Amino acid sequence: MTSMSGASPVIHWGFLGAGSIAAVFAKDLVGVPERHKVQHEIVAVATRDSEHRASSFAKNHCAPCKPKAYGSYEELVKDDKVDIVYISSTHPQHYEVVKLALLNDKAVLCEKPLTINYPEALELVELARARNLFFAEGFWIRFYPIVKAAKTLLHEDRVCGDHFRLFVDFSQDFRFRELPSESRLRTVSLGAGVLLDMGVYPLTWSRLLLYDDPKNEKQEPTVSSNALTFEDHNGDIGDYTTAVTLVFPKTESIAMLCTSMDRGKMSDDFLKLDGENGNQLFISGDCYRPQSIKLIRASGETEVFDFSFDDATGFFYEQDAVAECLLKNMKEAPEIPHEETLKMMQLTDQIRRQINVTYPADLRYTTA
């Protein structure tokens, strides 16, 4: 599956999708080799229907690699040189594209959200397991060292005690009301909706810090959600601002989460956690690219833990972790196991039911 360059293994990647996220992922994969513990090479790039676009992406974003360009996904997944495919198409396409790759015996890393709903995700996980293939959702923040540091402070050192009040906000001003009606962000059939686009980040932070608390004993929270919604040009309903409250009875903790495409970030700290002992923990940066932890004790003493970097975006943590999984013949990543992906999909399905947002993919699993 891998080849050798001297004494170092090389992981060969194929890209299914050549958009803006793929460009950033490619830059981190091969543009900052000093950041990596494993060697990576992009050997193939495909778009759904344009070899020219694939070739242009390869030339503009994959140097020093010289990947083969394909004008269809079907061609790339049959390329024997590819060890793993990275899928960055829009999320309504994930189910079909992941399934195509798995049926052609390719290991898969697929951008978040893995699918539109839980039944799609479950089917893909079961397919990967049946074919004994590595498969992971590309939720890159789970691989950041800052996440491990925050969990150590809270779950092992118990710096904020045992009962938490968590606030997380991920909001950006897309001038939503001014977007053209045919914009992807305003077309539900194309995956429009802030919950799946952005809201999964605050939800993930709540699971990392509250759900994963050993004292919670893996008990799922109660969920209450509200949203501001819009009607698209097809008459479908999507959400553009959504608020979710999660209550964890086992630890008497609560998470209040907000996400919006119609408001900008209010402060440098996207996350605040109040502890029962008066201590507070803040995480600054972006919800998807955290930079530092600040612990303010009730006494006024402040500690800052810096994890900032400016030479890359931050995908390299995920990329190396996935490579290590392949080299060790692991079938899922410990940072984002299949069980957690499925539980997150169940959670977003539950929230969507509460805010009355559905997608065409949901209709495949609706029974009379």
From Swiss-Prot:
Subcellular locations according to the entry: Cytoplasm; Nucleus
Catalysed reactions, semicolon-separated: D-xylose + NADP(+) = D-xylono-1,5-lactone + NADPH + H(+)
Keyword Transferase on entry: no
One Pfam family per UniProt: GFO_IDH_MocA
An MF annotation (GO) of this entry: D-xylose 1-dehydrogenase (NADP+) activity
GO process annotations (BP): D-xylose catabolic process
Membrane spanning residue stretches: none
PANTHER family: OXIDOREDUCTASES, TRANS-1,2-DIHYDROBENZENE-1,2-DIOL DEHYDROGENASE
Main function: NADP-dependent D-xylose dehydrogenase catalyzing the oxydation of D-xylose into D-xylonolactone. May also display activity with other sugars. May play a role in the regeneration of NADP(+) in the presence of these sugars.
Name of the protein this chain belongs to: Probable D-xylose 1-dehydrogenase (NADP(+))
Species, as recorded: Schizosaccharomyces pombe (strain 972 / ATCC 24843) (Fission yeast)
